């Protein structure tokens, strides 16, 4: 047990002694010069590539997409929302954070000769917790709409040969995405590798305030020091910091039960697991901010962004090393479908003998009433 954990000088920050924890510890301890080198490897910062030809499957000639898929059949799907993040920030803050992180990973893998595929976010308007209701600038989609959108995009990507899907979330709607992933698997039982990653939580240790020059000084909550810092690093022209204000939420019951956005305190409940214990956003923080964005600097976002890029690269590389393009885990181990029956569906799309998911026999329980 003594070698199970990699500790730091901060008792609340430690890492599991495995590939993931060792990677995080290395970045946590790295000098700023090494962090800068990591960011340079991924060409951070760079302008948004949403309109840049050859970045996303939607702005790349299909022939090129197919050729790249034969080398690397992993697809990244960034997920954000449209939400008030205070007068200083753009309402697409979440979307631009996550798309630029995904774009950086594509740039990096392209340099290595096997570019990961990147899909436009299907959820520019997302699901929200109840306490977001009533805020101007926040556009709330019904959870069923968000769930079905994700399920059908997963199906379409799978049908096009992108059967290893990493959905990267940048908004407070994780429970909906988790539910969609599980429903997709139950409904279709298609062999593949599917992940939803809440990227802030994936590298939560880097959002915990510590005594270091490049560290944040406050806990990550919403439209705060953490989010503004990431925005200042990745897309500073979309922010106007002279309009930033600091606020605090309002608790209506004793604290200590519900954690903040990245679960740094390991409290009994995550922030989304209740309502009524705190005032809704409209009543407590009509500014659309919970925290201190006035303290934000691009420098404070460099280590967290380096950490998520290295972690996502690890996830990507482990999948591709174990299951190269065109290969999946054994069908009989991850699906109740007969391997012989599913074989035509697993062929390269539009190749001889290939079958589309629209020819897929239905198995399993009824999925809707």
Task: Pin down the residues of each PLM region.
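Extended, histidine- and acidic-residue-enriched regions that form the cofactor-binding/catalytic faces
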Residues: 1-141, 148-164, 170-369
């Amino acid at each position: 047990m003594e070698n199970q954990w990699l500790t730091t000088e901060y008792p609340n920050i430690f890492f599991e002694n495995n590939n993931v924890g060792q990677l995080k510890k290395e970045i946590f301890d790295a000098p700023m010069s090494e962090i800068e080198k990591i960011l340079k490897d991924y060409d951070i910062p760079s302008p948004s590539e949403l309109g840049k030809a050859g970045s996303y499957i939607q702005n790349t000639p299909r022939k090129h997409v197919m050729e790249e898929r034969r080398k690397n059949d992993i697809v990244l799907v960034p997920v954000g929302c449209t939400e008030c993040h205070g007068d200083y920030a753009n309402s697409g803050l979440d979307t631009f954070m996550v798309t630029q992180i995904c774009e950086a990973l594509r740039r990096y893998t392209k340099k290595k000769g096997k570019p990961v595929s990147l899909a436009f976010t299907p959820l520019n308007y997302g699901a929200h917790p109840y306490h977001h209701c009533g805020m101007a600038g926040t556009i709330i989609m019904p959870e069923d709409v968000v769930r079905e959108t994700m399920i059908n995009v997963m199906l379409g990507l799978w049908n096009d040969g992108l059967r290893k899907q990493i959905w990267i979330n940048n908004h407070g709607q994780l429970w909906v995405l988790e539910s969609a992933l599980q429903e997709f698997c139950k409904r279709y039982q298609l062999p593949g590798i599917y992940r939803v990653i809440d990227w802030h939580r994936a590298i939560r240790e880097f959002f915990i305030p510590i005594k270091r020059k490049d560290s944040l000084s406050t806990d990550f909550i919403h439209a705060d020091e953490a989010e503004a810092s990431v925005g200042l690093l990745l897309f500073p022209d979309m922010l106007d910091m002279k309009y930033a204000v600091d606020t605090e939420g309002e608790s209506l019951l004793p604290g200590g039960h519900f954690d903040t956005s990245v679960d740094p305190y390991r409290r009994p409940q995550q922030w989304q697991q209740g309502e009524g214990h705190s005032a809704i956003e409209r009543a407590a923080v009509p500014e659309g901010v919970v925290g201190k964005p006035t303290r934000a600097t691009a420098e404070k976002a460099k280590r967290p962004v380096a950490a998520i890029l290295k972690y996502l690269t690890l996830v990507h590389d482990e999948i591709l090393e174990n299951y190269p393009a065109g290969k999946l885990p054994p069908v009989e181990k991850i699906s109740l479908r007969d391997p012989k029956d599913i074989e035509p569906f697993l062929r390269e799309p539009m190749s001889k003998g290939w079958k589309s998911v629209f020819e897929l026999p239905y198995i399993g329980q009824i999925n809707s009433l």
